[in-house]
Amino acid sequence: MGMSLTDRERQILSWIEQNPMISQNELAGRCGITRSGVAAHVSNLMKKGYIQGKGYVLTPPRYVAVIGAINMDVYGIAAHDVVGDSSNIGSIKSAVGGIARNISFNLGRLGVRNYLISAYGDDEEGEHVRSDSFANGIDITYCKQFSNASTSRYLSVVDAEGKQIVGLDDMKIIERITPEFLEQYEQVIFNAEAVVVDSSLPSETLAWVCSNVSHPVFARVVSVNKAKRLLPVLAELDTLVLSEAESQLVTGIAVH
């Protein structure tokens, strides 16, 4: 399994998951199409491995659990050479991001079913997170929206050539993704084919994942400052993805 679904197939599969005994006539009524049209979509779902037969017997879903940060990313891009201690002409752009969110998004584009587990606030940025997730097919069923909390933010300032001058993050809400937080979703995590984490998570949370998950754990470092959070669990990771600077910190070996 893992072949991508059309929007209509995804919609029909969702209804079947809610009621495996639903008839094709009822599905046709909900979709606003003919019963034969529904039959064709059901046939495609069977060919793609999502349904095993009439009834409907659903194939246990294979998926990846992605745990980490959702951010509102803000980028300041200088138009000319940067002058220190002064205002610089440039452009400012914003977009929903975060390492875990971006991994979830790209897995979806590759046709890999996944669930994102994260936290965000009830502020304006949090509403952007929700609308962006729905628009891009990111499943945030297991993301918690905290009241009276700010969504994680990341600010990057780059020069005219695209080289980063400084990056700042305000990710206090990610500290709420504790082992106790993840225990609410442990069945989702434990039944995943693989688990992906990023190093924005608290050290104790990373340790909990590596101690309790029996499937492969993949980790992505988010910054030099947070790379050290993965040091205690390196031996338990299946794969670690990091930059040159981050690799030097983790291994202690200079990269030339």
Residue ranges and their predicted role:
Residues P60-P61, H80-G90, R109-E193:
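Conserved N-terminal subdomain of the carbohydrate kinase-like
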Residues P20, G32, V112, F190-N191, ...:
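Short glycine/proline-enriched coil/turn segments at helix->beta-strand junctions
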Residues A194-H256:
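Conserved beta-alpha-beta core of the PfkB/ribokinase-like small-molecule kinase fold
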Residues G2-E17, I22-R30, T34-I117, E124-H128:
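Glycine-rich phosphate/adenosyl-contacting loop at the front of the ribokinase-like
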